[in-house]
Every structure is written in structure tokens, then in C-alpha cells.
Amino acid sequence: MSARLSFAALAFAVASCAYVEATTTQYVGVPKFPPTKAAAVQVLPGEPKQRHDRLGEVLLDISVDPAPPVADIEERLREEGAKMGANAVYVIRDAIRPGEGRKLIGIAIRFRQ
């Protein structure tokens, strides 16, 4: 009986886990940069005024119930932006749609010197 209870508890825990899944798209015709450190990538609420180049998009598929902490979402944006060589990622869309869940789109950018 305790094995069944343990299995049921494990199944519940797995089913109730929050998730942040990412898909990235690098833009065509944009120079490729070496990866940066995720900790150095800024997450911005909108497009910055500083001169920059757009490297690509980061699409996050985020669980709604339970929702992950905001820090986990921002960390995933940093990680994916860093893979493209970005200095920052700014959010262009963050929406929850019935039946689709939460979708967030960010643009990975590299500031010009």
C-alpha cells in the first residue's frame, strides 16, 4: 500500500510542476556572435533607446497553474539570449490565452559600441 501511495505522490508532484520551455529563432542575415554569460544579459521591459542590433527571438511557453517564479522566467530569457551572443533581451509580448497558456516573446539584442 505504501508503494502505491509513494507512486501517487510522485505522479502528483510531476504533474504539478511549473515549467518554462523555450524556442529560439536567430534572424537571417544577422552576424553571429560568440555566446555571452547569461548573468550579464539584461532583461528589459521594452526596446531600449541605445543603438543595438536585433539578433533573434525567444519564445517562452510558460505554465499557468502552477506559475513559475518571475526569476525563473527572466533566467530562461537570459540563458537563451546568451546563446545568441546577446547583451539584453526585451519583452515584446506577454499574454495568457485560454487553452494556450502563457506565451512570452522577447527580442535578443546586442548593443553597439
What do these predicted ranges mean?
Residues 1-17:
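Sec-dependent bacterial lipoprotein signal peptides
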Residues 39, 54-56, 85-88, 100-107:
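Envelope-exposed proteins and targeting segments
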Residues 55-93:
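Short, well-ordered alpha-helical segments
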Residues 2, 85-87, 111-112:
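Short helix C-cap/helix-to-loop transition motifs enriched in small/turn-promoting residues
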Residues 49, 67, 96-113:
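Short acidic, glycine/proline-enriched helix-loop-strand junctions
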Residues 35-69:
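Post-signal-peptide N-terminal segment of Sec-exported extracytoplasmic proteins
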Residues 15-33:
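Bacterial Sec signal peptide processing site at the extreme N-terminus
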